[in-house]
Amino acid sequence: MLQPKRTKFRKMHKGRIKGLAKGGSDLNFGTYGLKAVTPERVTARQIEAARRAMTRHMKRQGRVWIRIFPDTPVTSKPVEVRMGKGKGSVDFWACKVKPGRVMFEIDGVNEDIAREALRLAAMKLPVQTRIVVREDW
């Protein structure tokens, strides 16, 4: 699964996801893409599950680009532990996705296979998405 090799700080504030995506809102690599419509935190496991669903449907043809990276550590405290006594340890890594962000791109397969692969990937993600095509730009 994806996670940074090293970080400047071990833990991070939760924060909020405000506004629209500044960059990464256009297709750069593939012909078809999956664009986020709502703000959400996508975990490394969800990214991997979406990638596996796409590559399995495409039968290892074509090419998949993952345009997001989980760089935010999410902490949790153990079960049945009282409040206080410091922040919990890092549980998993996540990526804060803003509306308008292209998360996945596909190329090298026909349109029917690409749309179905992206639909299957969207089922694995907590974000509402829409499929975009390069000809739309």
Swiss-Prot record:
InterPro entries named among the record's database cross-references: Ribosomal_uL16, Ribosomal_uL16_bact-type, Ribosomal_uL16_CS, Ribosomal_uL16_dom, Ribosomal_uL16_sf
GO molecular function: rRNA binding; structural constituent of ribosome; tRNA binding
Keywords tagged on the record: Ribonucleoprotein, Ribosomal protein, RNA-binding, rRNA-binding, tRNA-binding
UniProt keyword RNA-binding, yes or no: yes
Keyword Nucleotide-binding appears in the UniProt entry: no
Superkingdom in the source lineage: Bacteria
The protein's role, per its UniProt record: Binds 23S rRNA and is also seen to make contacts with the A and possibly P site tRNAs.
UniProt-listed HAMAP family: Ribosomal_uL16
Family stated for the protein in its record: Belongs to the universal ribosomal protein uL16 family.
Protein name listed in UniProt: Large ribosomal subunit protein uL16
Species whose genome carries this gene: Ruegeria sp. (strain TM1040) (Silicibacter sp.)
